[in-house]
Amino acid sequence: MDIETLKERKKGLGGSDIAAIFGLSKWMTPYQLYIDKTTDEIAEEDIDNDQIYWGNLLEPVILQVYTKKTGRLAKKPDPMIWSKEHNFLFANLDAITNCGRIVEVKTSRISSEWGEEGSDDIPQEYILQIQHYMLVTGMQVTDIAVLITGSDFRLYEVHADKELQSIIIDKAKQFWQMVLDRT
């Protein structure tokens, strides 16, 4: 991710931030997220690490496979989409289809975290991320295209959950107020 995008991300909460707020992120604790949002510092690992490298390299390939398997054309949208209702929430989507679905691309080394293909049985942190994206965009369905262990391609489908989105809004508001108040 480029430096300007990382600076822009400090102005609000994105999908991966939501899992951290709930304490479900593998990558960041709520405290680390708070420090990230309240300082101007950009961590080196946010700019480049193996996961970012491989994710960026494989994303277009996974999207091509997604299009081939579903028949849905997936295109990269604007880098950051800000919520019209909650001005501190944004989404950085991997793709949007020609039929109004979000497509989230993942790579994973652990197949046991993923349920039956076609279901919504995916890791909790990704459920939060995806519900956040649907909350920000107003879209109702997200397809998850995941490449597991380098050769196992699977598709999952998650529908908007208004109850969970309401919980996300409440926790995000509380967290963002702490960021604004520096408390």
Model regions and ranges:
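Nucleic-acid nuclease catalytic cores
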Residues: 52, 68-176, 180
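Charged, glycine-rich intrinsically disordered N-terminal tails and low-complexity linkers that flank
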Residues: 1-61
